[in-house]
């Protein structure tokens, strides 16, 4: 009898729950179909409120964007975990969002919950925009021409040492999970060039574990619940505290021994002062160094992996790279001297290969800004409400046949007769030196506007030296009859090749190994 009553109660509750869910879905559909405000951008149709288009967007953002553009045009809104995300695609969309006025759009409210626990307090998105612009200026002036020139031999040595000592490249030929290998190479090159000798010496097993635990803090759920007591968040917080301690120890040691100063990024930041006269606090220096390590390594690791995968899928291009170096750099047509900064400008195919891979494989597919005031969209009847989030996707123009014929094909040679010029009329100073707004171009691998990446020049130097060194010493190829490259993994905040991404390798000169 008791069992029967329990079952009846359960059935009744289930019926009420089902009816309630059905009512919510019906009301959601009616609102979409009957009550649309004509000044609102079109809303992507969805069945379930709150969830909206979260799944389809998360599985393949670019497929989602292109599909929606066919149905709704360049401007549309979709629901992402209860948030109203207004997407504006194309060059005009990039301009509207990435060069939006500070009073109208805000990046800090979007990214601070995600980045502050990883990078640290009082920097980047955890401070007023004016302070961030000063911090970007400090970093930018640490990336001087002389500094970039000095980085080339350091980066080349790190790559050569890795090829000689890593178990991934033991012997004269083999197979390698290339995303793991490039993650290690890029953290070593960036660590040595940007972080200084003390930090590079600390890139041991402990530092790798700390980096891994911090990196796992960049998970989509932390956009919504950065404080959630998840195991990965506890590890993230512990890793941040330990990494900050490491940098603080280095800074304190240098202050005790000023005669041993070396001209690297830590030295540069230790001598920086805000406009109000306050020296850059040591805690902020430590947090900025963590940011440099994390932010730069993500994109370099991803794009260098894609480069190696593309070269493995088309070995003939790898040979073209090698022959370009022989033609342009070899004194005798056989041997190659150590790389120098000026050599990179003599290798157009190397540069074009990097550009083309960046075009196809941007690691960040969505750039978001919180709307602070209603924003009329020029040339349209739409007004973006203040409770929306704006989303720009520069990768969409880079993947469009309108701007790049046969855009889905990887072709480094397409850049030989193409020049991407900065619009001199759009030069602006946001507080960290003059830059181009950049949004008039369909190719924006490093973003645009006040939040444009300041590490662009270093990224090209780092990738250029890595590619040139690999081409000198290695041959790459696909294995097991595989064609092309792996699919893109969009499950993390920074997209990259799906794993496992295994390719074959052999040394170009095995007798020298």
From Swiss-Prot:
Highest taxon of the lineage: Eukaryota
GO biological process: methylation; sterol biosynthetic process
Stored SUPFAM superfamilies: Cytochrome P450
Molecular functions per Gene Ontology: heme binding; iron ion binding; methyltransferase activity; sterol 14-demethylase activity
Mode of membrane association: Single-pass membrane protein
Family, similarity comment: Belongs to the cytochrome P450 family.
Record-given protein name: Sterol 14-alpha demethylase
Organism field: Aspergillus flavus (strain ATCC 200026 / FGSC A1120 / IAM 13836 / NRRL 3357 / JCM 12722 / SRRC 167)
